[in-house]
Amino acid sequence: MDLLLGHNQFLGISHISEERSRERDKKFSDVKNIYKVVEKAVDLGYKGMILETHPRMLEFLKYYKNNETFQIDFYLQLPYIQGYIQKMNEQGLSGLILEIVRRGGIKTLSSTVLKNLINYVKKDYITMAISFLQFERAPFRDINIKAILLHNVVTDLLLSLRISSALEDYNIFVEEKMEIKPGFITLNFELFKKSFEDWNIKPHLVMTPINPGGYDMNPSSSAVETALRNYAGEVIAMNILGGGAFSPSVSCSYLKSFKNIEYCVIGASSNEHLKELIKLFKE
C-alpha cells in the first residue's frame, strides 16, 4: 500500500479548526513552502500527489517546473468545481468558457466565436465537456500525469442520473486520446461498483473515502466494505483519518484489512507528520 500526498492542506483546508485553516492558508500562500513539503515526501517514499487546477496549485506547478529537484507522479483531479461555480456566478457561462480556453493557451476569442461556443455547449454539453478536459489538462503537459480523476461531484451526479454514456465516453477519451489512465472519484462506492458492472464499463482507478468511522462512506460503511471486498480494480483510499477524527494507527490497521487498496491519500503538511504516517503504513 503506497502513499499519495493530498493537496487540500496546501489550500488552507482543515477539518479540525478555523485557526489551523488560517495558519495553513498563510503558510502555503508561499508556494515554496508547498514545494518543500512535497520534496520531503518524495524523499521519504511517497509515490505521488493529488493536484487540481486551483490557482495556488498552478502557481506551485510553475515553481516545480522551474526547479524540479525531485520526480513525482501527479494525479490530476478535474474539473475544478469550486472555481467553475465561482466564475459562473461572477461572469456567467461566457466568463467560464473564456477562463478554460485561456488555460489551453488561447489568449483571446472574438465575440462571434465565443457566442458559437456558448451555443455549442448548450446543445452538446457532453462533447464539449470532454473537449474542456484537454484545456484543463493543458498546464500539466510538461509533467508526469499518472492519472486523471473525475471529480466526485460529476461522477456521482452522472451515476445518480444513470448517464452511462458520459462516463464511458470520458473513460475511453482519457485512455485513448489523452493516453493517460482514467479514474473516478466517488462518495458512493457501492453505487459506483454496481452501476459500472451493470453497464460493463471497466474503470482503471477509483478514489473513495475509506476510514474506520464510516466518514463519507455512502450509503453505509458496511455496504462500502462489502463492495470493496468484492471489487477487483485499483482503489485509492481518501479521507482516511476522517478529518482528524481517527488516529493514524487505527486508520492504518483498518485500511490494511482490505487487500485491493493500492494507495492512500495523506493530507500531511509537516515533516513530522509525513514521517509518522509512512512509518506506520510501511510496517
Model-based region annotation:
Residues 14-26, 119-125, 180-183, 208-215:
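Acidic/glycine-enriched edge-of-secondary-structure segments
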Residues 56, 82, 137-146, 153-283:
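Beta/alpha (TIM)-barrel catalytic core signal, keyed to glycine-rich beta->alpha loops juxtaposed to Asp/Glu
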Residues 31-38, 42-48, 52-56, 66-160:
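Active-site beta->alpha loop and helix N-cap motifs at the rims of alpha/beta catalytic domains
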Residues 1-69, 254:
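N-terminal binding-site loop/beta-alpha segment at the start of enzyme catalytic domains
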